[in-house]
Structure formats: structure tokens, C-alpha cells
Amino acid sequence: NAGEVASGIAVKTVMSLVKEAVEHQDMNTVDAETGMSRHSIVLRDAIARANKIIYQTAKTQPQCEGMGTTIVACLFFDNRVAIAHVGDSRMYRLRANRFEQMTMDHSLLQELVDRGFYSQAEAQRATNKNYVTRALGVEPTVDVEVHEQPAQKGDYYALCSDGLSDMVEDEDIHLTISTFGANLETVAKQLIQLSNDNGGRDNVSIILAQVVDSFAAKKGVVDKILGWFG
């Protein structure tokens, strides 16, 4: 269907552009105006490009009219992670038994939570979860939300579609990662099974990652010399 076409374009475009940038650009720079790392900028721009391609495809191919998709993506670098998303696909982090949602949904429901009409607990049980306020391919341009967080050894990260987050409580996602974290493939299978057991109204997409060691960027000669002087 058209949604699968849109998500396929998004995955292919973002992966290709990020891979090309990492291999051929100087990634050790920071934008002087925004303070954004090159990694965040590359991720943002790749998603913006995917949006444009999806939008143009929908306009030129009648069978794809009105198609769109949500996205969440991340890029690990220098003991940090750049996180970008559009829509209600989410990223979670488990750190030292503290489980947190690292993205805020671009949805009508989240706006109602922000304005105090719903608590987070009430929002989890709400029926109007799927009205997104941002998506790829709907407009010629899109506002990609990007931020960075420190990444630590032992962290677990879960990126997922609403097919998981709508059907499985955050507490159960937390418990599943904590219980089966030694084998991420098992975690993924358990979470998909939980979603299906709870009604499985939508396809489930999930990516899991664990930080197994420090991945600080290698310093150049000048950086090392400056480091000697504190």
C-alpha cells in the first residue's frame, strides 16, 4: 500500500544520505549559528530530503496520492546520540533501570497532554492516539525535531512505530528489555508478541541497540597536545 511505499522511500533515502555523509564529509564540526553537530544536521537534512521525495512521488503517481509516514532515527557518535523524529514513532532509553521516552509525539493527543487536558496515564488509554500533526510526505517541507543526548555504556535504546507503543504499556516495554536484554533479538520478538497479544492493530517496527562500551571520537595530534595542558 501507499504507506509502505512512503516508509520504504524514507528508509532508503535516510540510510543512503547518512552513509554517504559519514563516509565523505568532515563530521567533526559544529554549526556556529545553531550549535548543532554535523551528525544532527546530516540526520535532519536526510529526513527533510526523504520528505521531499515522498511528497513529489505522491503528487506524480496517482496510486500514491496522499501517502505519508512517520519516522524516528538516530546516529551514535563520540559518546553521544543524535535523535530525529517526525510524527509518533518513538525512541525510548533504558539507563540504570530508569526507562524514559526520548521523543515527544507530534500528535493531537500529545498536544492535549501538554495543555493539561489529559495525564500521561489517561493518554495511554485514549482512543484518539493516531491523529499525527506532522508526517513525512504530507507537505513540501517538514519540521524535523532533532536533539542530542549523552550515551553511556550499558544504555539500551528502542526505536519503534506506534504499532508497538499504542499496544504495549511503557512499563511492559521496560520490563521486557530488563528481562531479556542479554539478547536483543529475543527482546524484539517478545515485544512484537506482546503487541499482537494485545490486539495488534498495526504493523510493528522496532530497532534495539545497546551501548556495550565507550565510543569517544579519536583525537587528533593537536587535541592530544592541548589535553596535556588541561
Task: List the predicted regions and their residue ranges.
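PP2C/PPM-type serine/threonine phosphatase catalytic domain
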Residues: 1-230
